[in-house]
Swiss-Prot record:
Domain named MARVEL: residues: 32-166
Complexes and interactors: Forms oligomers.
Function field: Main component of the myelin sheath that plays an important role in myelin membrane biogenesis and myelination. Plays an essential function in apical endocytosis. Regulates epithelial development through the regulation of apical endocytosis. Part of the intracellular machinery that mediates basolateral-to-apical transport of ICAM-1, an essential adhesion receptor in epithelial cells, from the subapical compartment in hepatic epithelial cells.
Keyword Ubl conjugation attributed: no
Intervals, Cytoplasmic compartment: 1-35, 90-99, 163-182
Ranges per topology, Extracellular: 57-68, 121-141
Protein name: Plasmolipin
Species annotation: Mus musculus
Gene: Pllp
Taxonomic placement: Eukaryota, Metazoa, Chordata, Craniata, Vertebrata
């Protein structure tokens, strides 16, 4: 049986040095907020919040169509927040192995398709579920309108993401230096 050595050499290091360096590097990139992708993300967040807040303030659980609208609106709102934070703090530069233009393209196309279905479901169910002119009717009508606007915003983002993925209007060096957003 092997015996343990009587002496073991160990090294210690301070974990605070590594943590402090990585935390200080997380500074918000205000250029992203001014970019087309940043402005569209803020628009998607604001309008998406309006969609699910307006639906949530009505008895939506009684109607399956509004359950779908709530799922789409809340899920895409949360995922958009995650992508917004990733790009705001330039975490996409640290996670360089992820093909971000392709990931965003897939997300925005999927979000556009999901919001098309949510908009159609929301708009089709408005007249069937509320008395015209009542508060739930007005809220659901407004939610349908904002769902249409969010759908358009995701569609525009999908178009810009497609251009970024294809590399239209830039070369690899400038798109890397610009952080991957227009």
């Amino acid at each position: 049986m092997a015996e343990f050595p009587s002496k073991v050499s160990t090294r210690t290091s301070s974990p605070a040095q590594g943590v402090g360096a990585s935390v200080s590097a997380l500074r918000p990139d205000l250029g992203f907020v001014r970019s087309a992708l940043g402005v569209l993300a803020l628009l998607q967040l604001a309008l998406g919040l309006l969609v699910w807040a307006l639906i949530a303030d009505t008895p939506y659980h009684l109607y399956p169509a509004y359950g779908w609208v709530m799922f789409v609106a809340v899920f895409l709102w949360l995922v958009t927040i995650v992508f917004f934070i990733i790009y705001l703090f330039q975490l996409h530069m640290k996670l360089y192995m992820v093909p971000w233009p392709l990931v965003l393209l897939i997300f925005f196309v999927a979000a556009t398709v999901l919001y098309i279905t949510a908009f159609i479901a929301c708009a089709a169910a408005v007249d069937l579920t509320s008395l015209r002119g009542s508060r739930p009717y007005n809220q659901r009508s407004a939610a349908s309108f904002f769902a249409c606007l969010v759908m358009i915003a995701y569609g525009v983002s999908a178009f810009f993401s497609f251009q970024a993925w294809r590399g239209v209007g830039s070369n690899a060096a400038t798109s890397q230096m610009a952080g991957g957003y227009s």
